[in-house]
Amino acid sequence: MHYEPFAIYSKKVTSLADLQDGAHIGLPNDPSNETRALLLLEAAGLITVPEGTTAASSLTKYDITAEMNPHGYVFDEVAAELLAPTLEDYDIAVINGNYALDAGLKPTTNGLFVEAADSEFATLYANIVAVRPADLDSDWLKALHTALTSKEAYDYMINTYEGGVIPTFTVEDAE
């Protein structure tokens, strides 16, 4: 139905171009989110990752060689839920969408670089409704699906969360 994009945030720089060599970068310390964060840093042009790395890979800061990190950024691994409240401790931090929203951060206004809505992660990490096979044709599920994929739900996500929650369906699908 929707996903919350990762974004790069900072209280110290207003542009990634201002990031100094040796800057400290806060990363989520759990495997799936750290991979996602490192791939976002690559998409932003800050580092490179090993060839063949995908969203399904398990990547950590230890996989990033000096050659892949020519600016000598220091990666600080922290529990994902602590990155937004401690943002001032890092030059930049890659923060999960839900934690950013909880801290009042919005990708479109506060994010220095935001995960693309058509990224591999948008599909892989989309929030969905899972049901038992026996309920697939139930009236309540049809009603729930209609409500969650309605134009009203689409507009609510777009207007309320300002890029912090992205519908995985199009407005045309909702009409």
Language-model features: locations:
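Periplasmic-binding protein-like
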Residues: T35-E42, T146-F169
